[in-house]
Amino acid sequence: MSEQTPRDDGEIFTLVDEAGNEELYKEAMRFQSPETGKWYICLYPLDEENDEEVGIQAFAFEEPTSEEDELELLPIENDAEWEMVQEVLNTFIDDDGNFNA
């Protein structure tokens, strides 16, 4: 069953860049595409949480099969997926640029 209403579990993720630096990110939202059934998650840097603008990172992922499994973030594979994620994200940004999930 597709979940069309995004949800925010408020999870904190540690992302590691190419130089090996760790940065904490907070979940903005996750949703499942009704067309493909794939799951997506949008994250922002935790240290930008109270800033007027934050940089959003988006990833695909597969739902873990058990609570012990960690969520594995996957790169978004093509332009069509990026456009779909951007469209969903834009539906939750108001005219003032505030995110309202």
Swiss-Prot record:
InterPro entries associated with the record: UPF0473
Pfam families: DUF1292
Family: Belongs to the UPF0473 family.
PANTHER family on file: UPF0473 PROTEIN CBO2561/CLC_2432 (PTHR40066), UPF0473 PROTEIN CBO2561_CLC_2432 (PTHR40066:SF1)
NCBIfam families to which the protein is assigned, alphabetical: PRK13678.1-4 (NF010217)
This protein's name: UPF0473 protein LAF_0524
Source organism of the structure: Limosilactobacillus fermentum (strain NBRC 3956 / LMG 18251) (Lactobacillus fermentum)
